[in-house]
């Protein structure tokens, strides 16, 4: 257990440093290309602010998951969602293709769960357990997408949940949960009020997906 915690802390520190470096580069690119989040009634910013920080956070998060055998498919799913979400950030996508991509990524992970790994602890039959887990996970992903655009909120929520999962879950969940928290903390350097950068769909959707997956595994 102690060795798992130590390796998780080391991986998290590396992820924090890499995210800070990558985010600085991405921020310059977004400013150059004028990829901006325009203020609306939900916004806490009054000026156009670069959007697309997920180009930095998601690859670091996915890489840290890919080097852990138990979480490789979660990392692959995060990269797939980065690709579709970046298109949405740049050009906009209708809800159908976006939700379909989210559904495929979530369903793929649920199908990999062993039949005796019941998310709702056996209260429901297997088919109902998986359907409810699918709907809950999709809701969670889209909740994260909705939160983006408000200074600091997504980063603080992600940091808190990551640390909470690491403390409560322990074991093999420690390292990925600490990495999630570390990447979120690094992003907060740029997203704290007044925000210099927002995640965009390319960051908020994969964050919600990965955290949702860890919560399912915790259950």
PLM feature spans:
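"…together with the soluble PPM/PP2C metallo-phosphatase catalytic core" -> "…together
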Residues: 1-219
């Amino acid at each position: 257990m102690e060795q798992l915690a130590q390796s998780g802390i080391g991986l998290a520190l590396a992820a924090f440093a890499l995210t800070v470096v990558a985010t600085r580069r991405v921020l310059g690119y977004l400013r150059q290309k004028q990829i901006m989040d325009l203020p609306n009634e939900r916004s806490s910013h009054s000026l156009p602010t670069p959007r697309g920080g997920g180009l930095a956070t998601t690859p670091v998060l996915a890489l840290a998951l890919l080097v852990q055998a138990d979480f490789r498919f979660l990392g692959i799913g995060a990269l797939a969602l980065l690709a579709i979400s970046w298109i949405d950030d740049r050009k906009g996508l209708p809800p159908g293709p976006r939700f379909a991509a989210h559904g495929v990524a979530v369903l793929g992970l649920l199908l990999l769960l062993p039949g005796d790994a019941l998310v709702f602890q056996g209260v429901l039959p297997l088919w109902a357990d998986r359907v409810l887990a699918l709907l809950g996970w999709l809701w969670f992903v889209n909740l994260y997408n909705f939160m983006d655009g408000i200074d600091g909120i997504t980063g603080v929520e992600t940091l808190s949940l990551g640390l909470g999962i690491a403390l409560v879950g322990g074991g093999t969940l420690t390292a990925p949960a600490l990495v999630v928290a570390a990447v979120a903390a690094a992003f907060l350097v740029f997203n704290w009020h007044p925000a210099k950068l927002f995640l965009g769909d390319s960051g908020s959707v994969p964050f919600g997906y990965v955290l949702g997956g860890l919560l399912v595994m915790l259950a």
